[in-house]
Regions:
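Charged, terminal alpha-helix-loop-beta segments
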Residues: 1-100
């Protein structure tokens, strides 16, 4: 997302600091939260609060806003919460290292 020369990471809004704010060619916004490991059940609440803020802010009126949470080993509770919210998607990443 670009704002007067700023784009990419750490987009700041009054209620917090987004890891990434992205915009597609149709003007839809994507709040991306990146978590370094598991144990982030509050990631849903945090992302939902960000989405609610964008939906209420007049500067973003008419834009669709979605949340994307990326983390390693999400709990079933987090999976269930995200699947129940049509605004959000959940991605799990895995890292492996191989000695060469």
């Amino acid at each position: 997302y670009k704002r007067k020369g700023e784009y990419g990471r750490q987009y700041i809004i009054p209620i917090g600091r987004l890891d990434l704010l992205c915009e597609d060619s149709q003007g839809n916004l994507y709040v991306v939260e990146l978590k370094k490991d598991s144990g982030y059940d509050d990631a849903y609440k945090q992302t939902a609060e960000y989405l609610d803020w964008f939906e209420k802010d007049k500067r973003f009126k008419g834009k669709k806003v979605y949340g994307i949470i990326c983390l390693n080993s999400p709990t079933q509770q987090l999976i269930d919460k995200v699947h129940a919210d049509k605004r959000m998607r959940l991605f799990e990443y895995q890292i492996s290292y191989t000695e060469l």
